[in-house]
């Protein structure tokens, strides 16, 4: 409740100042429509001031959180709260669009690491996989061990450097001979393993995102392309 109240405060009171924006627009128009061909410097200053004015004070505040330990995780969680209330007003909806664009810069795919997750990964990371599997529930530690340690099973995830144990999105892959008849055949843990190098087919049978606050910041297609390359 407290965080939602804080988000409403940011949306209502810390957006772009319309009076200041109007002044900046008028200053830019005066320079742009001026007849002085030597006024390029003034026009550039007006453009710079206009861009600065268009950046809401709340965005500057959120940027400060990014500097803190686990700051990006905190902000992703904060946006998940905003998503649940953004329908309440136009100002909250506008705030959400700004927030999403901000997160998209911090979670740009160029900053993310593709990792193959193995059974030797930290327990916290394995627990996150189990808790966020959205397609085929992990039924036991034996189940997750099979998915990670079997010679014909792989798991790949996109990891942000500041969130090493919180994969943003992950995918399970089964290496097989031919296409499996059904998904249950892939999920059974007592199947004979396909020896490394003998598989002729890779089946991507599940992909799950873990951060609701990054909704709209797409990683899925990038992850698939990277795993195909691997």
Name each region found by the language model.
Residues 1-230:
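Extended, composition-driven regions rather than compact fold-specific motifs
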């Amino acid at each position: 409740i407290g965080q939602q109240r804080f988000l409403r405060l940011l949306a209502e009171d810390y957006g772009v100042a319309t009076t200041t924006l109007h002044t900046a627009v008028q200053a830019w128009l005066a320079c742009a429509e001026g007849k002085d061909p030597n006024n390029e410097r003034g026009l550039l200053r007006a453009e710079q001031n206009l861009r600065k004015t268009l950046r809401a004070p709340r965005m500057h505040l959120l940027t400060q959180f990014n500097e803190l330990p686990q700051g990006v995780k905190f902000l992703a969680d904060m946006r998940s709260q905003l998503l649940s209330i953004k329908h309440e007003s136009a100002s909250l909806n506008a705030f959400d669009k700004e927030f999403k664009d901000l997160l998209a810069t911090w979670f740009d795919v160029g900053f993310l690491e593709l990792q193959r997750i193995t059974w030797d990964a930290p327990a916290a990371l394995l627990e996150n996989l189990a808790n966020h599997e959205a397609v085929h529930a992990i039924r036991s530690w034996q189940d997750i061990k099979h998915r990670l340690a079997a010679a014909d099973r792989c798991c790949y995830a996109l990891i942000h450097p500041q969130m090493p144990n919180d994969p943003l999105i992950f995918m399970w892959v089964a290496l097989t001979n031919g296409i499996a008849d059904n998904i249950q055949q892939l999920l059974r843990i007592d199947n004979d393993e396909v020896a490394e190098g003998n598989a002729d087919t890779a089946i991507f049978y599940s992909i799950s995102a873990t951060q609701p606050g990054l909704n709209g910041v797409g990683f899925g297609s990038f992850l698939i392309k990277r795993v195909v390359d691997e």
